[in-house]
């Protein structure tokens, strides 16, 4: 898109929004302050560098075999840098523990150290990014069906030690980069068939978490993540929503809400306001579940729009940490990053551009026809012209222009892998 066209369209959109009492410049400034936490695992289908030929376990699945998958740390970084160059704004990167710079050495998960992630810290600083971190319970000989909730004390100790070390790594990331790192704990623990020991397993998980959080990490924002089920673990998940919600609230931690980790008829957006009333902050994993936790690429759909609305309209942008979590191996992986990131940003922008003051005035007066009418009209306002201007401000391609950049990178880089 030509710059003069973008500017002209923005000026018209600005005037149109002003008629509804909305300041587009203020919305753009607010959008600029939202840092998405990009997930490193879209580059390589959650393979990591610990065991590149290993099998993905833990009830999760990356489907597809599109060529060009990143095979090592340099390719992962190059792909993230390319995606970053096509996404407006300043963003973070979320790493799993299996993405350490192990330099070809076998380092088991209860032996990981900050030194294995120092090159990531240096890379992030050089690329004007901050880092977040995740312990990794899956795809390991000791994963099985149970990790932190395993009745075998030795196995449980192994995973406690891994998680303690993961938090220390996150603490070092936060310290060196001057921004607290979100550390998220998600474990796959569960059962394929019926269990008669739910209370016991959950007691073990609570005990393990208590041991993990004995260690103080001042540069970390701690989060715990629930899930309804995983493939092969359909009948019981130890870390249910109720378990982690209770644990998070009682221990002053963040609860992580992943859009794919609930029943298809549950809406994550409806949980936001309740969680914010009892927790200082929450962590979100923006995803797109199709019938189950399929981790499809995020698109600009109703679920994402309503999620953004709840956050923006609650005035909670400074209390919600927004991460992406999906991995589609069936399409260009760099393109997947750009589509999902832009869709999420567009949802937040649309929420910011909605005349919420007028809508609440209608609602307070019982004028429900007017409320619904204005909500509907807001959808067709020229918000896309505002987003294109945001792209121009940040020096990235506007509109569909990024498609050519992704195709060029594929021709010159990923297709040769």
At which residue positions do the language-model features occur?
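Extended substrate/RNA-proximal surfaces in nucleic-acid metabolism proteins
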Residues: 164-167, 173, 179, 202-209
């Amino acid at each position: 898109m030509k710059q003069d066209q973008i500017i002209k369209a923005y000026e018209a959109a600005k005037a149109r929004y002003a008629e509804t009492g909305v300041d587009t410049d203020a919305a753009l400034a607010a959008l600029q302050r939202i840092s998405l936490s990009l997930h490193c695992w879209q580059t390589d289908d959650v393979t990591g560098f610990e065991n590149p030929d290993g099998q993905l376990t833990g009830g999760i699945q990356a489907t597809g075999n599109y060529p060009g998958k990143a095979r090592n740390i340099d390719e992962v970084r190059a792909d993230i840098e390319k995606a970053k160059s096509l996404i407006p704004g300043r963003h973070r990167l979320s790493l799993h523990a299996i993405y350490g710079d192990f330099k070809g050495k076998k380092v088991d998960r209860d032996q990981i150290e900050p030194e294995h992630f120092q090159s990531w810290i240096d890379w992030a600083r050089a690329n004007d990014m901050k880092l977040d971190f995740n312990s990794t319970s899956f795809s390991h000989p000791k994963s099985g069906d149970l990790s932190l909730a395993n009745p075998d004390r030795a196995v449980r100790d192994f995973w406690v030690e891994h998680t303690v070390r993961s938090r220390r790594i996150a603490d070092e990331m936060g310290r060196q980069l001057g921004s607290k790192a979100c550390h998220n704990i998600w474990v796959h623990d569960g059962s394929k068939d019926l269990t008669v020991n739910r209370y016991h397993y959950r007691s073990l998980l609570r005990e393990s978490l208590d041991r993990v959080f004995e260690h103080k990490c001042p540069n970390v924002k701690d989060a715990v993540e629930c899930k309804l089920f995983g493939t092969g673990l359909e009948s019981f998940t130890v870390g249910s929503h109720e378990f982690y919600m209770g644990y998070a609230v009682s221990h002053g931690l963040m609860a992580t809400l992943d859009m794919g980790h609930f029943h298809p008829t549950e809406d994550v957006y409806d949980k936001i306001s309740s969680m914010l009333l009892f927790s200082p902050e929450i962590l979100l994993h923006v995803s797109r579940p199709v019938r189950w936790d399929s981790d499809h690429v995020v698109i600009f759909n109703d679920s994402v729009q309503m999620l953004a609305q709840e956050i923006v309209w609650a005035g909670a942008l400074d209390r919600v940490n927004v991460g992406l979590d999906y991995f589609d191996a069936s399409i260009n992986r760099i393109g997947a990053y750009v589509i999902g990131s832009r869709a999420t940003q567009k949802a937040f922008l649309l929420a910011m551009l909605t005349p919420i003051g007028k809508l609440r005035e209608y609602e307070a007066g019982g004028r429900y026809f007017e409320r619904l009418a204005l909500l509907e009209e807001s959808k067709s306002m020229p918000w896309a012209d505002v987003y294109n201007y945001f792209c121009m401000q940040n020096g990235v391609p506007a509109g569909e222009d990024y498609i050519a950049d992704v195709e060029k990178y594929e021709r010159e880089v990923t297709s040769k892998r």
